[in-house]
Structure formats: C-alpha cells, structure tokens
C-alpha cells in the first residue's frame, strides 16, 4: 500500500481588522497611527506653568493624556517614551513671586504701622486698583475686580469704625482683615513701587518649586503616571540659547535691544514652511500673540522692537526686578514658546511622534513651537501627530474665579474619588468639551456603583471555586453559557473597535455596560447553576480593562475595585479576600445560625442585635452583609467610606420617607380640620366675608353686586346658589351631629 499524503489545507480568508486612528490637529481629521520607529513612540506633553494650585482645567488635560498613554502602552502594546516639561521661568511666575515677597514683608510691617499712615497708603492702593478696574475690558475679570474692590472698601470701613471705638483688640482684627481682603491690590501697588528692586533669584525659585511639588502630589492623587523624563526650563537655559542661535543662523530670527524675535513673515515666505499650521485662520491675531508674550513683555517699548506685530520673542531682555541668565545677546530669559521646542528636541531630535496639550494652547503657543522648531532644523515637519484635549466647563460655564466656580484638584477630590473623576473623563471624548457638573459626576458615580455591584456579586457567587477541588472549578457548558460567551466575545470586539477609533472610551464603556447587563440577567435566571469560570472571565476582563484605563490601581489579578484598608491606603483586593474574608464568613455563618434560632424563639432583642451587626458594626469595618431570601447570605468586602456613604444615604432616604409620611399626615389633619370648620359656617354667612369680591348681599346672604357696584349676572347667581345649597347640606349635617351628641 502506498503512503498517504496530507490533504490540501485551505487557508482562512483574511479579515479586515480595525486600525488605530487618532484625531490629528494638523489635519483636523482621524489619521492612521504609524510611529516613526516601529513599535517605539516618542511623546512630548506640555506641562504646567507652576505659580498656583492645579485646577480641574489641568485635570482635563492630564487625566486625558494619562488615559491615552496607558491605552497606547498597555492595550496596543507600544513602547512609549513620555516627556513632560515644567515651566518654571515665566512672566506670571516672576510677577507672582515678586508680589508675594513684597506683600509678606509689608504685612509684617503693617501690623506696627501707625493707623493714619496705613490708611493713607490705603488711599494710594485704592486709586491704583480703581485705575486697573477702569482699564479692564474682560467682563468676567471685571466682575472679580469689582468684588475685590467691594471687599476692600468694606474692610476699610470696618477698620475705620474700630478706630472710632478705640478698641485695640478690634482694631488689630480689622487691620488683619483689611490686609487679607486687599492682598491683591496691595501686592500690585507694592510691585509698582518696589518690584524693580528685587534682585535675589531665590525669590523667583521658591514659588515654582513649591507649586511644582503640589502639582506632582495632585497628579499622584489622580493616579496619573509620572513622565519618563521631566524637563525644567531653568535647567535647560544653555540648550535653549543654542537652539535660538540655530534659528538666527538660518536667517529666521533677529536680535533687537538684547532680545531675540522670530521672523514670522520671513519664515512663512520660505517654500517648505507654513506659519500657523494648526490654526491658519488665526494668522495676524495680535491679541492672542500678545497674550502669548506674557504680562511683562507687552509694553510699547518691547512691541516697537519687533519688525512685525506677528513676530514673537525667543529671548527676552530682563529688566530690573526680573531674573536673568547670560546669553550672546545680553542678560535675559527664554520666551515661553521656545522652551518646549528646545527641550523636546534635545530629548527626541528633529522630529517625534506625538505632541499633546490643551486646545487653548493651539494658537499661538503650539503654532509658534512648530514654526521655530522647523526653522531650527530647516525641516517641513517637527511633529507627526498633534493631539489636543477639549475645554472644560463648570456646570455649563467657563471656569472663572469671578464666577466663583474655580475648582482646584484638591477641592474636587474632597467631593469625589480619583476613580469617579477618571470615569467621568472616560465617559466623554478626550477631544471634546467636558462639562464638570453634578450631573456629570452623578453619571460617573452611578457607573462605578453599577460595575462594583457586579464585581461583588460575581466574587460572592463564585468564591467557592477557589477553595474546592480543581475538577469542581469547571461547570457544565450549555446553550445558556454559549449565548453569554458569544455576547462576551462581541463586547470584546466592540471595545477594540472603539479604542481603535480615536481612543473612544465612551463607546468602550457603553459596550462594557451592555456586557454587565446581560451577565446580570444570566445570574438572575441561573442562580442554581451558574458557570463560575465564565462569570469570572467576564469580570476579570472588565477589571483588566479598567486597569488599562487607570480607573483601578494596584496589582493585577483580582476582580473589581480595590478595597481600602483600615489606614485608608488602598490594599490589594485579592489579599483582603485571602486574609480577611475567612474570618468574616465565620462570623456571618455564626450570625446566620443565631438569627435562625432567634426567629424560631421569637427572640426579637437578639434579632435586633443581628440587624445592628449587619447595618452598623460591619459597614464600619468595610464589610457588607446581605441577608438573602434564597440561600443564606452574601458577604462582600467593600471600601469602608463607600459603605458609610451608602448607610448615610439609606438613613437620609428613610428620614425623608418618614418626614414625607408626617407631612402627609399633617396635611390630612389640616384638611380634615378645614373641612370641619367649613361645616360650621352658616350658609347665609358664607359669602359675607368676601368683601374683596362683592359689595352687596340679599336677605339670604347671596351677593347681588360685585366690588365695583355692578349687578352680579344671573348665571353667576345660579352658581353661587348651588354653592350655598351644598353648604346648607353640610351645615345641617353639622347641626344634626351636635344634637346627637
């Protein structure tokens, strides 16, 4: 017999799989993402200017960047080299540092100043601040300035009254109140008088160092990954000087009075260059260009140094009261836009993959970055993909101190957890406007609760498989499981397609919501024979995805959100499951047996103690114990703070229900009393008190003329007679009840 050969094999047909596309601001459309170097991605992100507390506007960008970074790295598998800068040399920092220093000195002296001298200085402060208010044209800022002016005037009035009373203690209190309320106007006044005298660089270093630390703490609190490389402007001045010199050598920058400016028109005329790639319609927007130059760099003498109003500063000559570094053009400091160009290029070279920033930085900052970098390298492209996060509004309004809706990150974290904030961002597109409001956060909170209940149920229902013999961990597979598995697979396909489509986390979470819903239906309909392995696979997939999104921190391998330990630090849920749960289950089993016996014996005091253990004692320990109609009970380890909030909400709901019941009872009693009082009215007198309607009545008490003296119509008299007849019936019933009594 001849040897048989293998039959022909039919290769499966290739299926088109979705490719990762990102919305590129350089083209204003979604583009296939193709890194310059295979699987390696170079990424530069604009960091903060550190002179004040980080707010939700910062969170909008940095949480979104973190989500994008994690997904590209942990889901798509790219090797990302992530660089972020810290702007610690800037006009805002210089002015704020100078003013803080001068105010602190003044406040210490002002406590000892004679009152007439202090009040005399106050008039100078007031005059300068009133001039500032008059010049301002920004409506929101004007509201804020007017409120500051009002508070300052009120504080001065209070101080003047205290002086009149001669009460030294009250004078001291009102003096301090004035200094606090007028801090900004006083600081500005002092800066105008003494700002040029500040020449200690330590003054300009302390402020950004402090706020940089606060920024990093905020990022850690939000579970945002630190950058691989952090660049500070103050540590890059020599490289920035070299970078500027390259632009000068290429004929696209010029020195003027110890400053250096970028030649926008000269750049735009060159064939390979194009100014304002991101926002071409903003070319010539001098207002935005001046804002980008900085508060200390828009005086007439500075503006007159430019060849064109479109030109912008690469190097600023420092005046008295400003920090400086040596350069070939004189003592000065870097311009804002050149900082990012020089630092990113120092790390990555002449081109890199991704540049990210807030949408408000498109023009002029990012457009100027592109221009000066392309000028330095004499290339037509510096960045391949420019990604911009959308604006953030507060309850539909622009975030503004004047509107009293300015929310710092720490203030936001007092109301909602980092997980809830991240879920709110995940439920919105990263490139669109996000409205931070009660409605937005309620959606995020409910989504978190929805997922958490699913995780807790799965862990409770499938916990036994971890302790049983290996063979018992595999349950029978039926059509029901096959249907759920198909929906599970479809959800994975939908999630992948969503993430490929410009990292659409909102659609991905919608697919997860649907998967959890069908899984909950499976649990409801198959309580007696659940396939534990399938349920755990679904829950583990969702948990891993939330890890990728940064919504869950800590080690992987468990199911659900981590449970907070007694110290408040997040412990690994799997560790608590292993170490704590056996003891809690023993307690729950003992309580169950006691409770069943108490039911039999009708021992209500013992039942009350069992309820107290469930409702008050265990929640304080992070344990939710649920009594079941079918089966014994369910034990779930939950974050203690979440449980306490649940309990408070439940108690509040019960209190509201009781209050509503009492309100209805009171309303019913009042209605009954009113009805009883109405029965006692003689029908002939029922209209006599309505003098605001009628002016004359007949012998039976029926109105004959209205308040203006006109006769009441026949139709109206018929209606009144009917009402009187009804009252007569009620009145007779009342008289009968008295006689009977």
Curated annotation (Swiss-Prot):
<feature type="binding site">
    <location>
        <position position="401"/>
    </location>
    <ligand>
        <name>ATP</name>
    </ligand>
</feature>
<keyword id="KW-0862">Zinc</keyword>
<keyword id="KW-0963">Cytoplasm</keyword>
<dbReference type="InterPro" id="IPR014729">
    <property type="entry name" value="Rossmann-like_a/b/a_fold"/>
</dbReference>
<dbReference type="GO" id="GO:0005737">
    <property type="term" value="C:cytoplasm"/>
</dbReference>
<dbReference type="GO" id="GO:0005524">
    <property type="term" value="F:ATP binding"/>
</dbReference>
<feature type="binding site">
    <location>
        <position position="340"/>
    </location>
    <ligand>
        <name>Zn(2+)</name>
    </ligand>
</feature>
<feature type="binding site">
    <location>
        <position position="365"/>
    </location>
    <ligand>
        <name>Zn(2+)</name>
    </ligand>
</feature>
<keyword id="KW-0030">Aminoacyl-tRNA synthetase</keyword>
<dbReference type="InterPro" id="IPR015803">
    <property type="entry name" value="Cys-tRNA-ligase"/>
</dbReference>
<protein>
    <recommendedName>
        <fullName>Cysteine--tRNA ligase, cytoplasmic</fullName>
        <ecNumber>6.1.1.16</ecNumber>
    </recommendedName>
</protein>
<feature type="short sequence motif" description="'HIGH' region">
    <location>
        <begin position="48"/>
        <end position="58"/>
    </location>
</feature>
<feature type="modified residue" description="Phosphoserine">
    <location>
        <position position="297"/>
    </location>
</feature>
<dbReference type="GO" id="GO:0006423">
    <property type="term" value="P:cysteinyl-tRNA aminoacylation"/>
</dbReference>
<feature type="binding site">
    <location>
        <position position="369"/>
    </location>
    <ligand>
        <name>Zn(2+)</name>
    </ligand>
</feature>
<keyword id="KW-0547">Nucleotide-binding</keyword>
<keyword id="KW-0067">ATP-binding</keyword>
<feature type="region of interest" description="Disordered">
    <location>
        <begin position="697"/>
        <end position="718"/>
    </location>
</feature>
<feature type="short sequence motif" description="'KMSKS' region">
    <location>
        <begin position="398"/>
        <end position="402"/>
    </location>
</feature>
<dbReference type="InterPro" id="IPR024909">
    <property type="entry name" value="Cys-tRNA/MSH_ligase"/>
</dbReference>
<dbReference type="InterPro" id="IPR032678">
    <property type="entry name" value="tRNA-synt_1_cat_dom"/>
</dbReference>
<keyword id="KW-0648">Protein biosynthesis</keyword>
<keyword id="KW-0436">Ligase</keyword>
<feature type="compositionally biased region" description="Basic and acidic residues">
    <location>
        <begin position="704"/>
        <end position="713"/>
    </location>
</feature>
<dbReference type="GO" id="GO:0004817">
    <property type="term" value="F:cysteine-tRNA ligase activity"/>
</dbReference>
<dbReference type="Pfam" id="PF01406">
    <property type="entry name" value="tRNA-synt_1e"/>
</dbReference>
<dbReference type="InterPro" id="IPR009080">
    <property type="entry name" value="tRNAsynth_Ia_anticodon-bd"/>
</dbReference>
<comment type="similarity">
    <text>Belongs to the class-I aminoacyl-tRNA synthetase family.</text>
</comment>
<feature type="binding site">
    <location>
        <position position="46"/>
    </location>
    <ligand>
        <name>Zn(2+)</name>
    </ligand>
</feature>
<keyword id="KW-0597">Phosphoprotein</keyword>
<dbReference type="GO" id="GO:0000049">
    <property type="term" value="F:tRNA binding"/>
</dbReference>
<keyword id="KW-0479">Metal-binding</keyword>
<dbReference type="GO" id="GO:0046872">
    <property type="term" value="F:metal ion binding"/>
</dbReference>
């Amino acid at each position: 017999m001849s040897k048989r050969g293998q039959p022909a094999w039919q290769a499966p047909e290739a299926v088109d799989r979705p490719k990762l596309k990102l919305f590129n601001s350089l083209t204003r459309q979604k583009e296939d993402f193709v890194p310059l170097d295979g699987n390696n991605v170079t990424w530069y992100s604009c960091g903060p200017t550190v002179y004040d507390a980080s707010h939700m506007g910062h969170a909008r960008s940095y949480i979104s960047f973190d989500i994008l970074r994690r997904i590209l790295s942990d889901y798509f598998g790219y090797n990302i080299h992530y660089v972020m800068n810290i702007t610690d040399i800037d006009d805002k920092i210089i002015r704020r540092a100078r003013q803080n220093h001068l105010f602190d000195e003044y406040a210490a002296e002002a406590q000892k100043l004679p009152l007439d001298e202090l009040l005399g200085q106050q008039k100078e402060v007031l005059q300068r601040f009133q001039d500032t208010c008059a010049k301002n044209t920004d409506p929101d800022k004007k509201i804020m300035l007017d409120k500051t002016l009002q508070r300052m005037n009120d504080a001065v009035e209070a101080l003047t009254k205290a002086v009149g009373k001669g009460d030294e203690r009250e004078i001291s209190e009102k003096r301090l109140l004035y200094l606090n309320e007028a801090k900004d106007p006083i600081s500005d006044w002092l800066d105008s008088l003494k700002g040029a005298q500040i020449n200690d660089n330590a003054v300009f270093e302390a402020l950004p160092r402090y706020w940089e630390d606060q920024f990093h703490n905020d990022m850690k609190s939000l579970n945002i990954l630190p950058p691989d490389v952090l660049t500070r402007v103050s540590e890059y001045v020599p490289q920035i000087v070299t970078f500027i010199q390259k632009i000068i050598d290429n004929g696209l920058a010029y020195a003027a009075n110890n400053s250096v400016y970028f030649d926008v028109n000269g750049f735009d005329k060159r064939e390979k260059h194009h100014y304002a790639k991101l926002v071409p319609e903003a070319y010539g927007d001098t207002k935005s260009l001046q804002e980008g130059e900085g508060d200390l760099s828009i005086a007439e003498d500075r503006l007159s140094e430019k060849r064109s109003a479109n030109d912008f500063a690469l190097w600023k000559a420092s005046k008295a009261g400003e920090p400086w570094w040596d350069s070939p053009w004189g003592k000065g400091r870097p311009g804002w836009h050149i900082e990012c160009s020089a630092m990113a290029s120092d790390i990555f070279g002449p081109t890199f993959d991704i540049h990210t920033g807030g949408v408000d930085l498109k023009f002029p900052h990012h457009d100027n970055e592109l221009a000066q970098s392309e000028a330095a390298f004499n290339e037509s492209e510096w960045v391949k993909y420019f990604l911009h996060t959308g604006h953030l509004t507060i309850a539909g309004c622009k975030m503004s101190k004047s509107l009293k809706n300015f929310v710092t990150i720490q203030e936001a974290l007092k109301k909602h957890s980092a997980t809830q904030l991240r879920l709110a961002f995940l439920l919105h597109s990263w490139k669109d406007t996000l409205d931070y409001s009660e409605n937005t956060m309620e959606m995020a909170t409910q989504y978190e609760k929805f997922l958490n209940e699913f995780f807790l149920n799965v862990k409770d229902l499938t916990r036994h498989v971890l302790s049983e013999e290996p063979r018992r961990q595999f349950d029978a597979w039926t059509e029901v499981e096959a249907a759920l598995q198909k929906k599970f697979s479809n959800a994975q396909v939908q999630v992948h397609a969503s993430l490929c489509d410009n990292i659409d986390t909102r659609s991905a979470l919608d697919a997860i919501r649907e998967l959890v819903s069908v899984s909950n239906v499976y649990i409801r309909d198959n309580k007696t024979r659940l396939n534990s392995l399938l349920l755990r696979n679904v829950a583990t997939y969702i948990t891993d995805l939330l890890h990728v999104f940064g919504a869950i921190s800590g080690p992987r391998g468990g199911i659900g959100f981590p449970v907070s330990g007694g110290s408040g630090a997040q412990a690994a849920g799997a560790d608590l499951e292993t170490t704590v749960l056996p003891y809690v289950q023993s307690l729950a089993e003992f309580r169950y047996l006691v409770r069943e016996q108490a039911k039999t014996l009708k021992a209500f005091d013992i039942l009350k103690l069992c309820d107290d253990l469930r409702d008050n004692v265990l929640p304080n320990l992070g344990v939710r114990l649920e009594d079941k109609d079918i089966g014994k009970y369910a034990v779930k380890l939950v974050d203690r703070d979440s449980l306490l909030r649940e309990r408070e909400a439940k108690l509040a709901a019960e209190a509201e229900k009781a209050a509503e019941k009492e309100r209805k009872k009171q309303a019913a009693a009042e209605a009954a009393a009113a009805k009883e009082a109405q029965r006692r009215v003689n029908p002939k007198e029922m209209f006599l008190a309505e003098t605001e309607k009628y002016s004359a009545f007949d012998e039976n008490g029926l109105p004959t003329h209205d308040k203006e003296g006109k006769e009441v119509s026949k139709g109206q008299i018929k209606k009144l007679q009917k009402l009187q007849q009804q009252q007569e019936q009620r009145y007779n019933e009342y008289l009968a009840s008295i006689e009977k009594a």
